[in-house]
Curated annotation (Swiss-Prot):
Membrane topology designation: Multi-pass membrane protein
Coiled-coil positions: none
Protein name: Sodium-dependent glucose transporter 1
Listed GO biological process terms: sodium ion transport
PANTHER family per the UniProt record, alphabetical: SODIUM-DEPENDENT GLUCOSE TRANSPORTER 1
Amino acid sequence: MAIAVLGPTFLDLAENVESSVANISFIFVGRSMGYLGGSVLGGILFEQINQHLLLGISMLATAAGLFVVPWCKKAVLLTAVMSVVGMSMGFLDTGGNIIILNTWEDQAGPHIQALHFSFALGAFVAPILAKLALEFLPLDKKSFNVSEPFLEQSALPFGIKKSMLSYIVIGTYILLVSLFLFILFSKSRPRQSSGKASDDKFRTARYHNAVIFLLFLFFFCYVGAEVAYGSYIFTYAITYITNIENNYAAGLNSLFWGVFAAVRGLAICFATCLYPGTMLLLSVIGCTLSSLILVLFSRNHLLLWVGTAVYGASMATTFPSGFSWVQQYTTIGGKSASLFVVGAALGEMAIPASVGYLQGMFPNFPVLMYTALASSTMTAILFPVMYKLATAQQDQAQYNRVESDDRRALLSSSGMEEEDEDEAQNWNEADFETIEMNDQMKNSVTVISEDTPGNSAPSEILKHSTKSNGAEAAANKSPSRKHNTDREKND
């Protein structure tokens, strides 16, 4: 709501700062720059500081910025305030996706679809809220003793214009949300350091950086085409299609965003029974086919309505499904999530600006439809490449796991063989020592027997006894004997 409320109240803001629409157009640039800065900074801080605390601070900064907007009487001050609001929105987009991915991990599909549905719901509610603030404000000219025309311009205390009340209402709602986040932070346990995270919850694809960069380009094309189509479909219908009324063109615009929001709501249910990759593939196919129809039948009224509806429905689930899909193959941290948001923001700025410039140069050419087709073709090329790179880590990881097990088994078996060889060598040395001792004793007995012939019988007996004892000792000390003895003990 904080972002969408700017459109319906843009003329009121110009009047509030007493400037022209052209002079305050810089607030969009300021908000976009703040959004980019908040996305990058949030990606770094969300890995270091408690995530609920950062979300609470960002929501509090958003509420403060919206409260200050009605008192901004200078275009420069209004641009600075919008930069702060944009920065807090960058924090919110990055942090919201990170918290959901970290909390539900592989089951984050329905939850991240619900998050992005809330974005579409807020964009739908903001214009209605801005209109209701003017119609149901409980103030009248009698309470302030002012005339009817002046009541429409300044019917609130402190010089606040009545049209600025929507910023106060939305700011109050966001302030309450920030208080709940601070309460959640006070009840949450301290987060463990990333170094203590288990390996099961942290996985990295073999081509992690390549997948992240390609998904950055994917979101750049997707979000740029989405914003360009939603922004220029009304102008395209008025300028390019002949014999068309403003109500018809406005109906195309409402159809696109209405189907977009409705399908995002239905995607919460679809995500419970479909894989994120399946939903992303259906979105890519739907965008490609519908944009092709819009190019081939760019002047056909019926197919323009059908193509717009299908294109809006296909666009609805692409961004959240992309987050859920890549989380299945590689862990998405703060920096990666911020890179996705930055890519989307850059596409939101670059592609619509390019469409506007080219449409002015070639008014008789359907630039918008060809831009949609080019973006859809680019995403259709990027998705198979990303899938191939993301799934390559499964085969490689399995190969590395088998290879490490084999290497571990070989090392253990070689270690056992070396121990057996050392033990056998030691026993062989012991056998040789025993044989040498027997030879020495044999020689000594022989010498004695030669010197004393009369003692030949006892010498023979002693010689025979010595041989028997030596053989038994050698047999008892040999590995084979030891093995047989152990076997007998076991038996």
